Amino acid sequence: ATGSPVAECVEYFQSWRYTDVHNGCADAVSVTVEYTHGQWAPCRVIEPGGWATFAGYGTDGNYVTGLHTCDPATPS
């Protein structure tokens, strides 16, 4: 289950191999990535100014459609 959209200070940059997420906020954020094909993505805590790497869109065009808040303590 995904939460609400993340704040505008959290951005993602996608390529075919990796999706890098940057936290430009003043506080740590818990983020997961939503994909076109509904692929599962982990919940990662990103410290202020920090980065996290998720899967890219690959050869089948499984693009990132958005970032959402999540609870890192909840097993999926």
From Swiss-Prot:
Entry-linked Gene3D superfamilies: Alpha-amylase inhibitor (2.60.40.20)
Top-rank taxon, per record: Bacteria
Any one Pfam family match given in the protein's UniProt record, by short name: A_amylase_inhib
Disulfide bond residue pairs: 9-25, 43-70
Record's signal peptide: none
GO molecular function: alpha-amylase inhibitor activity
Database matches in InterPro entries: A-amylase_inhib (IPR000833), A-amylase_inhib_sf (IPR036379)
Key words, A-Z: Alpha-amylase inhibitor, Disulfide bond
Summary of the function given for this chain in its UniProt record: Inhibits mammalian alpha-amylases specifically but has no action on plant and microbial alpha-amylases.
Name of the protein described by the UniProt record: Alpha-amylase inhibitor Z-2685
